[in-house]
């Protein structure tokens, strides 16, 4: 009787563990027309996400900074714009971004949107933390789409530490950069 009860408790614990595991999924959305490797690339601030009809400010710019650092670590010449003309609060105008990139000597540009952002587990709400990012790569001369990739990472159903959703910046950026470089 006691060993049966122990087995049931162990099985339930194992199932609870499996159901609360985190996941990371990244894919190349379009076939690449040209590689970012060997090009001078500018990364515009990623557009801030919306949750329940409200824009969550302050997510897109730090996400773009981490993404830029991952590109640099992969050997890609990448920078953020020096102009404050572009902000994560507004969707980047493609034509304006292409002009800015071409005028400043960049051969490619990356525009991104944080498509999903949920901070839940840190509040013990039973809601899973989620971050999702979609990026598009354009040629600065023609403004033609060269590639696009997206990724989504979700946390566990619970957490034992106060770990904000910003913890997904690094792994999600790294995997999307890997997808763009393949």
Specify the residue positions occupied by each region the protein language model found:
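Surface-exposed short loop/turn segments
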Residues: 91-145
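Short secondary-structure boundary motifs at beta->alpha junctions and helix caps
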Residues: 126-132, 138-182
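Soluble non-cytosolic domains of exported or imported proteins
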Residues: 54-62, 91, 159-171
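Sec-dependent bacterial lipoprotein signal peptides
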Residues: 1-21
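Acidic helix-start/capping segments at beta-turn-to-alpha-helix junctions
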Residues: 79-94
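Solvent-exposed loop/turn segments at secondary-structure junctions
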Residues: 48-51, 85-88, 115-119, 153-156
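A structural "domain/chain start" motif
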Residues: 19-81, 179-182
């Amino acid at each position: 009787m006691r060993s049966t009860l122990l087995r049931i408790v162990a099985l339930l614990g194992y199932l609870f563990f499996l159901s609360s595991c985190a996941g990371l999924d990244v894919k190349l959305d379009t076939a690449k027309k040209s590689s970012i490797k060997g090009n001078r690339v500018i990364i515009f601030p990623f557009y801030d996400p919306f949750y329940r009809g409200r824009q969550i400010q302050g997510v897109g710019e730090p996400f773009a900074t981490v993404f830029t650092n991952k590109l640099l670590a992969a050997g890609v010449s990448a920078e953020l714009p020096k102009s404050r003309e572009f902000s994560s609060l507004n969707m980047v105008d493609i034509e304006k971004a292409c002009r800015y990139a071409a005028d400043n000597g960049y051969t490619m540009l990356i525009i991104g949107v944080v498509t999903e952002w949920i901070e839940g587990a840190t509040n013990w709400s039973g809601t899973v933390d989620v971050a999702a990012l979609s990026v598009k790569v354009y040629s600065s001369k023609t403004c033609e789409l060269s590639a696009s990739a997206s990724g989504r990472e979700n946390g566990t159903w619970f957490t034992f530490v106060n770990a904000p959703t910003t913890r997904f910046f690094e792994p999600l950026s790294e995997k999307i950069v890997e997808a763009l470089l393949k």
